[in-house]
């Protein structure tokens, strides 16, 4: 049986964590990005399908390729973030299932149903994006996830000729708390949950 993490860890991962819009000029190392992936890859996905693929944009040249896809409200915070992760999903993720899920012929579940494959890839890559956010927080980083961008432009600029499609963007770095907005409310248990 697992032990509960400390109250301090819960604060870091959830209750005190914020979505950041401003960033300190502290770089995020390639080693840290590798450490992030080494943590988040263990989060569960359906049949261990692991459809998410990540592009970590760290250079000015990479940010300029991304710029035309960004909405005006997401432009400045993305250009100044040390890292922007493109979270994509592989439309042919099932080709890795003989390696990732060798217990049966899971590949055929998806090759026989393109709709199931797309739904599975999108849903599970979204879950993996959440694991990446939690891994960032666990390593002392801050994040700013965004869906306000032109997906087709990102796909054309970064994934042309591939089986990858963009899902969302996540800015990653060390946040500038002076640029945080007031904390917004969340739905109560009664508003969001049911008990049967």
Curated annotation (Swiss-Prot):
Catalytic activity, reaction form: 3-hydroxypropanoate + NADP(+) = 3-oxopropanoate + NADPH + H(+)
Induction and repression of expression: Up-regulated by the nitrogen regulatory protein C (NtrC also called GlnG) and repressed by RutR.
GO BP annotation list: nitrogen utilization; uracil catabolic process
Cofactor(s) annotated in UniProt: FMN
Alphabetized UniProt keyword annotations: Flavoprotein, FMN, NAD, NADP, Oxidoreductase
Pfam families: Nitroreductase
Matching CDD domains: RutE-like
Single GO term (MF): 3-hydroxypropionate dehydrogenase (NADP+) activity
Enzyme class name: oxidoreductase
InterPro entries found in the cross-reference section: Nitroreductase, Nitroreductase-like, Nitroreductase_HadB/RutE, RutE-like
Documented EC number(s): 1.1.1.298
Superkingdom in the source lineage: Bacteria
PANTHER family in the record: MALONIC SEMIALDEHYDE REDUCTASE RUTE-RELATED
HAMAP family (UniProt xref): Oxidoreductase_RutE_HadB
Biological role: May reduce toxic product malonic semialdehyde to 3-hydroxypropionic acid, which is excreted.
Protein family (similarity comment): Belongs to the nitroreductase family. HadB/RutE subfamily.
Name of the molecule in the record: Probable malonic semialdehyde reductase RutE
Organism in which the protein naturally occurs: Escherichia coli (strain SMS-3-5 / SECEC)
